[in-house]
Amino acid sequence: MQQDLAGRVALVTGAGAGIGRATARALAARGAIVGVNDLKQELVDAAVADITAAGGKAFAVVQNVATREGIGQAVRQAAEHGSRFDILVNNAAWVRYQSAAEIQDDTMDRMLDIGFKAVIWGIQAAAEAMDPERGGAIVNVASTAALKSAPASMVYSGIKAGVLGITRAAAAELGGRGIRVNAVCPSAVPTEGTQRNRNAERDARRIASTPMGRLGTVEDVASGIAFLASDEARFITAQALVVDGGITFTTL
């Protein structure tokens, strides 16, 4: 693995499991010093141990990034591990799928706090921490649900579509400072968090409708994020990289 991120300081929110944990591993494998964020100390410690055992560099950031203060503190804590702060991956989310009739204030508020507001507060904090001469990279984890939706996903789809809007607006505003802002849009990826919404029949339909003939993995998504965070994507900003094996824009 090329060490193209050597010495750069990164923060991945929601990195105790799933896409976030795989992303932390991918960035560390490319040489980054990675802040692993989650709410649960045991998840963070396990992820950090996983990275260090593989020869990477990582540190724990146990903060509630659903608040402006929490994500700000997480970024500041990460910045203390190097001479600058370079990469933010806004990955944290809390998801519930409900029909239009079932949506409640508390569910929607929590999803908005973690999946929408935290993205804005994270960008704000990262932009302040990044070196104005060197810039940096921000990658927001959206979803193919922002592009093509399904029943019982009104709140989720709306939030992820909003993340794409935030991404483009932030890219326009921060590009002059050398800060690139992009998003990834994964399709349904098997993780610990998505287990409750999966079943064999639905997975089989998705596989049959996917040109690549399989479900995506957390490593597939992490590779896309690592690319967008790297200098290989130095002239790429305001983009949404769809990581879905082709299912969103094809019909089989």
Sequence positions of predicted segments:
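Residue(s) in the substrate-gating loop at a strand-loop-helix junction
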Residues: 143
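Active-site helix of classical SDR
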Residues: 123, 159, 167
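Short, small/polar-rich loop/turn modules that mediate ligand/substrate recognition or access, typified
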Residues: 135, 175, 180, 236-238
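Alpha-helical segment proximal to the catalytic Tyr-Lys
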Residues: 128, 172-176, 234
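Substrate-binding pocket helix/loop in short-chain dehydrogenase/reductase
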Residues: 99-100, 104-112, 206
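Active-site loop immediately N-terminal to the catalytic Tyr-X3-Lys motif
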Residues: 101, 148-154, 176-177, 213, ...
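Short C-terminal tail/terminal secondary-structure segment
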Residues: 148, 226, 237-252
